[in-house]
Design a protein with these regions (language model features):
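Peripheral, non-transmembrane regulatory/ligand-interaction domains of membrane transport proteins
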Residues: 1-219, 223-226, 230-233, 240, ...
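Hydrophobic alpha-helical transmembrane segments and their immediately adjacent juxtamembrane loops
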Residues: 229-324
Length: 324
């Protein structure tokens, strides 16, 4: 479904909400700048991409498919096909959601396609409506602004992951639970998903900033280099976040191990206290006929006192040794 269609005429006038016929006519002129945004490609949209824009069937199939494709760039001489990814991090469910944006860059048009609403695209649509100058600089700058907005939206995700990491570190240190371990492992998976998004896109931006594609002007290349620098910085932050998550996991395992050691120490002390008591009880439980203490009037109470003295003495000894 065509979500929005802009056309910046050669005279600088911006037209919005274009019909299918207007899109065909403006594209045929080869003048001005056309931006068509498609959300959740329908059969009619697929015909527009195939028959009007004449895109290759394979890239049209990529747009129709609901699968997530790896970030990439394909050069078809008269247009570029770029796939980039955005990230949404749901802090409640601790899950990273990857969103895919496909861009077609032609001589006088930009076509964007995505399956779900994207904050970066919605933000650019609002900005263009308020200031048509964003389209006056050309298709390469319009594509840059779209990708730059998408990359900028990754930073809040990293900040949220960092906050979650700090929270899990506190839990792992003071109150480690099974749920804490599950959250740590989910965070590690989210960081891995983020890394898989960033690394390929960094290489794409590197190619766009080095003059490898004729549709990217020399003036725009420096701006793509800026996106590349942002992705390098994000990559460094992500690697740092990964190391911090590993540290939190180690903290959790150490805390659980320490707690287990404390439990084992208490159980060992209890067992040690009862060893001599069990020994005494065992002797007087042998039921030999000739055991004088069994007939003694105060034998029972004497044995209880002896056992109490032994138990208390061991407790005092353990406390002095700081084992209790």
């Amino acid at each position: 479904m065509i979500k929005c269609a802009f056309y910046l005429a050669p005279d600088g006038k911006l037209l919005d909400q274009l019909s299918m016929e207007q899109i065909k006519n403006f594209l045929a002129t080869g003048e001005g700048l056309l931006w068509v945004d498609i959300e959740d490609v329908t059969n009619e949209d697929a015909e527009l991409l195939s028959n009007v824009f004449r895109f290759h069937p394979l890239v049209v199939a990529d747009c129709i498919s609901k699968n997530i494709h790896p970030p990439k760039i394909d050069d078809f001489d008269d247009y570029l096909f770029v796939i980039v990814h955005g990230i949404n991090y749901h802090i409640e469910s601790e899950v990273v959601e990857t969103t895919e944006l496909a861009l077609f860059l032609g001589k006088n048009y930009v076509v964007t396609s995505h399956d779900v609403p994207m904050r970066s695209v919605s933000s650019m649509l609002d900005r263009v409506r308020k200031d048509e100058r964003l389209m006056r600089r050309g298709v390469d700058f319009l594509a840059h602004d779209l990708i730059d907005t998408l990359v900028d939206n990754i930073m809040p995700t990293i900040e949220e992951m960092d906050e979650k990491n700090d929270q899990l570190e506190a839990e792992a240190l003071h109150e480690p639970k099974r749920e804490t371990l599950m959250s740590i492992m989910q965070l590690k998976r989210s960081i891995l998903a983020l890394t898989r998004v960033i690394l390929p896109q960094r290489e794409i931006m590197n190619g766009l900033s080095r003059g490898e594609y004729a549709l990217i002007s020399e003036r725009a290349q420096i701006y793509y280099r800026n996106i590349y620098d942002h992705l390098v910085r994000i990559e460094m932050l992500t690697l740092g976040l990964r190391d911090m998550a590993e540290s939190v996991l180690s903290t959790y395992l150490s805390s659980v191990s320490n707690r287990m050691n404390e439990v084992m120490k208490v159980l060992t002390i209890i067992a040690t206290i009862f060893i001599p008591l069990t020994f005494i009880v065992g002797i007087y439980g042998m039921n030999f006929a000739n055991m004088p203490e069994l007939a003694w009037r105060y034998g029972y109470f004497t044995i209880l006192i002896v056992m109490a003295v032994i138990g208390i003495s061991l407790v005092v000894y353990f406390r002095r040794r700081r084992w209790l």
